[in-house]
Amino acid sequence: MMKMRWLSAAVMLTLYTSSSWAFSIDDVAKQAQSLAGKGYETPKSNLPSVFRDMKYADYQQIQFNHDKAYWNNLKTPFKLEFYHQGMYFDTPVKINEVTATAVKRIKYSPDYFTFGDVQHDKDTVKDLGFAGFKVLYPINSKDKNDEIVSMLGASYFRVIGAGQVYGLSARGLAIDTALPSGEEFPRFKEFWIERPKPTDKRLTIYALLDSPRATGAYKFVVMPGRDTVVDVQSKIYLRDKVGKLGVAPLTSMFLFGPNQPSPANNYRPELHDSNGLSIHAGNGEWIWRPLNNPKHLAVSSFSMENPQGFGLLQRGRDFSRFEDLDDRYDLRPSAWVTPKGEWGKGSVELVEIPTNDETNDNIVAYWTPDQLPEPGKEMNFKYTITFSRDEDKLHAPDNAWVQQTRRSTGDVKQSNLIRQPDGTIAFVVDFTGAEMKKLPEDTPVTAQTSIGDNGEIVESTVRYNPVTKGWRLVMRVKVKDAKKTTEMRAALVNADQTLSETWSYQLPANE
C-alpha cells in the first residue's frame, strides 16, 4: 500500500469532534501543499488480474446494488453509489463522508456490488477500495433517483441536468496537452463528501489532486436542476515546471458533422458530443469555432486577457440531425465555464485529435495562463461549469449566433442552369438570434470576412433565410496549398453595427 505522510482518517476523526470544527478546502490544501514539497509516489494497484485484464463487457457486469446506496436511509435527496475497480480503473481512491462533527472513511465492501458472471475470490477483494463514485438525485421525477454526477478515472468528472444524458467530460487539471513530451494526467486520489441535510439542494465535494508535477485542492458545489451548475474552487501547487497548464479543461468527441461529413455512408448525419468551441473574450467579442476531426493533430490558440467564458457546445438539438436512438446525441449537454475574478493574460486553447470512431475523446479545450508561478507557490482559480441544453441563452438577445456550418463543393450556375464545380470550397453559415429575428427581411445585412495567407475568398454573399428568420452567409474559398490549414473569419454587420458573434473556422490540411 502507498505510504501516507498525512493524518489518517482515524486520527482526523479523533481531531475533528469539536462542535466548532468545520471541514473546508483549506484542510485539503494543506495536504496538497505538503505533497508538492515531496517527491511523487506512483500509486500502486492492488487489483487481482481477473479484474485488471477484464474486457469492457465483463466490467459492465459489475453493478452497484441500488438498495445499498449510501445515505439510502437518510432523509436527503442525494444518494451515493460507488464504482468497482476493473480494466484501467485499477487504482483505489479514498472516499470520506464529512458530517458536522467528523470525517469518516467510507469503507469498501464487495457486498455493495453484484458481479454477474465475473468469477472472484471474496477474500482477495475484501480490501480493494473503490475506483470512484456517482451522485444520484431526483432531477427528472420526484420519485426516481437519477445519476447526475460521475467521478471516475484520473481527474475526470461528468455531470448532467434534467432531461440530459452523459456526453462530454470536465477535468480537474490538464498538463502538457498536445505537447511532444506527452500529456500528464493528474488524478483525484481522495474525496471528502459533505453529508447533505434533508432540505439541501446542493452537494459539496472536496478532492485532493496529485500528479508527478502538480498537486491541488478542489471544492465542487453541485447544484442540480434544468441546468446543473458546478461551482469550482481550486488551489494548485506545482512540484516542478510544466510546459503547459490547462485550467478548467473540457474533453469531448467530434467524429463528423455537416461541416465535415462522414467519408463513409452513415444513416446518422452527425456524430459528436460537441460541435463547437464558444468563447466570450475579455474584450467582449464572442467567437464560435466549429470542431473538426482532422487528419493530423491540430491546436488552436485564442489569446486574451481575463476571459469572460468558454465552453464546448452541442448546438442544434433536433433529433433529425443525429438519428441515433441508442446514444441520443441530441440530449447530450453543453458545458460552459464562467471564470470568477480576473484570470489575467493567457489563451483559450482547442486541441483536435484524429479519431476513426466515436469511442475516443478527441477534443480538449482549456484556459492556459501565460505566466506560471515557481513550484510550491499557490495558484487560485474559481469558476462555474454549467451543463445545459439551452445554448442560445448564453447570448444577449442582440448578439446573433451561428446555428449551423455546412461545407460543400463550390460551384457556379451556368446559363443552362446546370451547376458547374469551379475548384472552390463553399461554406454555408446560418446566423440567428432573438433580435435578428425581428429585423425586416430587407435589412442590408452584410458580412465582414477575412482569410489567411493560404486561401482566397472568391465570393461572399448574404441573404435572408425565411425558415430561420435569420441570415445565411455563403462563402466560396480557394485553397492555395491543400497540405496546409486555412483560417477564415466572418461576422454579420448592418452598417457600423455588429450583429453576430465571429465565425472562426479552420479548414484542416489534406481535406
Swiss-Prot record:
This is Glucans biosynthesis protein G. Contains a large N-terminal domain that would serve as the catalytic core subunit, and a smaller C-terminal domain that would act to modulate this enzymatic activity. It comes from Escherichia coli (strain K12). SUPFAM superfamilies: E set domains, Galactose mutarotase-like. Belongs to the OpgD/OpgG family. Pathway: Glycan metabolism; osmoregulated periplasmic glucan (OPG) biosynthesis. One of its GO terms (cellular component) is outer membrane-bounded periplasmic space. One of its GO terms (biological process) is beta-glucan biosynthetic process. Its main location: periplasm. Involved in the biosynthesis of osmoregulated periplasmic glucans (OPGs). Pfam families: MdoG. Residues 1-22 form the signal peptide. InterPro entries: Gal_mutarotase_sf_dom (IPR011013), GH-type_carb-bd (IPR014718), Glucan_biosyn_MdoG/MdoD (IPR014438), Glucan_biosyn_MdoG_C (IPR007444), Ig-like_fold (IPR013783), Ig_E-set (IPR014756), MdoG_OpgG (IPR023704). It is found in: Periplasm. Coiled coil: none annotated. Keywords: Periplasm, Signal. HAMAP family: MdoG_OpgG (MF_01069). One of its GO terms (molecular function) is carbohydrate binding.
